[in-house]
Amino acid sequence: MKILVMNGPNINFLGIREKGIYGEQNYEALVSMIQKKAEELGADVEVFQSNHEGAIIDKIQEAYYNDVDGIVINPGAFTHYSYAVRDALASVAAIPKIEVHISNVHTREEFRHTSVTVPVCNGQVVGLGLKGYLYAMEAVVDLAMKK
């Protein structure tokens, strides 16, 4: 079982930016949590982060060629406007995908209430902090096993 966990813009600044929203833990702590969860699930995991839209699209396309079984993605701000990321996710329709957000985007600024990417994902986890990634990983493994 291969899982790709993808993070978009500014996720690498966890523990630095807006601690009241995103918490005190840094990006390395998140990666460590993800790796531990993958071990528990018996899965191989690749964790990827980029502040660049094209790099995220390239990684989604690579997932197809690398026989990735499931994708967990936090597109960051690309969630709200990147039809290019949305189309890349749609192009790998056979791969289960869960969108995750650390904060509850539905209770924040109005522009955050819309996700152009979630309609091409199997589900969404929001507002559960960094643990949301772990729940998303469980869900994507479950979906992949049902394929």
Curated annotation (Swiss-Prot):
Keyword Amino-acid biosynthesis tagged: yes
Top enzyme class: lyase
InterPro entries xref list: DHquinase_II, DHquinase_II_CS, DHquinase_II_sf
Active-site residues per Swiss-Prot or TrEMBL entry: Y22 (proton acceptor), H101 (proton donor)
Chain positions recorded as substrate binding sites: N74, H80, D87, I102, S103, R112
Known catalytic reactions: 3-dehydroquinate = 3-dehydroshikimate + H2O
GO annotation (BP), single: quinate catabolic process
Single GO MF descriptor: 3-dehydroquinate dehydratase activity
Subunit structure: Homododecamer.
UniProt function note: Catalyzes a trans-dehydration via an enolate intermediate.
The protein's name in its UniProt record: 3-dehydroquinate dehydratase
Organism for this UniProt entry: Lachnospira eligens (strain ATCC 27750 / DSM 3376 / VPI C15-48 / C15-B4)
